[in-house]
Curated annotation (Swiss-Prot):
Compartments where found: Cytoplasm
Name of protein: Tyrosine recombinase XerD-like
Domain Tyr recombinase: 90-238
Species of provenance: Lactococcus lactis subsp. lactis (strain IL1403)
Cellular component GO terms held in the UniProt record: cytoplasm
Active site: 154, 204, 236 (o-(3'-phospho-dna)-tyrosine intermediate)
Classification of source organism: Bacteria, Bacillati, Bacillota, Bacilli, Lactobacillales
Superkingdom classification of source: Bacteria
Length: 238
């Protein structure tokens, strides 16, 4: 029995975000290519598992999960006459010991009355996961205070990030933000350092940790951060 190509139909049946859809498409096209000259059997699925064993454990688990969901879809739609499932990769103790789980911080001091540019920068990084390069490209008009969202454009791709009320009530009265956004990276770095000993990288990581805690999938988080791959995020999901 051959593996039928129902990738487009499968993706159309799922309510995926554009980024998640793209990642599923990539994984399933790779699976389809592997079975191009092979029959769909338990033995060949094991060979597929061996082929991807050089990837990180997180990447292996993602690909196996994608394949298993697709195989279940095919069986439920009677495209195959047997339900196949690849056994998931087991996380070894050594991998658990090496997992990366920094402590989540709340930064209550960031949410006091706004007193300096560095505090505003810290809030932008903590609330939206922005880096200095992205902050420099911001315009005050990107903030929609009526509907509470921030629009960011990067490499021709727009992403829309929700604005929380605790951020809005502290910063929406600012009238000279564009002056700050136009400053050099060194200026932004210096102003942030005046306000807090935490670096922009450390604060941005806290944004990531809070999103993981909130239940965002690795693909959803990559979309929020404007990333084209999930490689740098895998350590937070091990």
């Amino acid at each position: 029995m051959k593996l039928p190509n129902e990738i487009d139909e499968y993706l159309a049946s799922r309510n995926f975000s554009e980024n998640t859809r793209s990642n599923y498409h990539y994984d399933l096209v790779s699976l389809q290519a592997f079975f191009e000259d092979k029959s769909l059997t338990t033995e060949n699925l094991e060979l597929y598992k061996i082929q991807i064993s050089n990837l990180s454990p997180a990447a292996q688990r993602r690909k196996i999960s994608s394949a298993n969901q697709y195989l279940l879809f095919l069986y439920q739609r009677q495209k195959v006459d047997q339900y196949f499932k690849i056994k998931q990769v087991v996380q070894k103790k050594s991998q658990t010991a090496q997992s990366y789980h920094p402590m989540i911080k709340e930064f209550p001091e960031f949410y006091g009355p706004l007193t300096c540019p560095g505090q505003f920068l810290a809030l932008l990084i903590l609330e939206f996961g922005l880096n200095f390069a992205e902050i420099q490209k911001l315009k005050w008009e990107n903030f929609n205070w009526n509907f509470k969202y921030l629009t960011i454009e990067k490499a021709g791709i727009k992403r829309v990030l929700p604005i929380r009320e605790k951020f809005a009530i502290r910063v929406k009265a600012i009238n000279n933000a564009d002056e700050l956004f136009a400053k050099s990276r060194q200026f932004l770095y210096t102003e942030l350092k005046k306000f807090t000993n935490y670096s922009s990288k450390e604060i941005r990581e806290q944004y990531i940790l809070h999103q993981v805690k909130a239940g965002k999938s690795i693909y959803e988080l990559a979309t929020l951060l404007g990333l084209t791959t999930i490689t740098t995020l895998e350590k937070y999901y091990r």
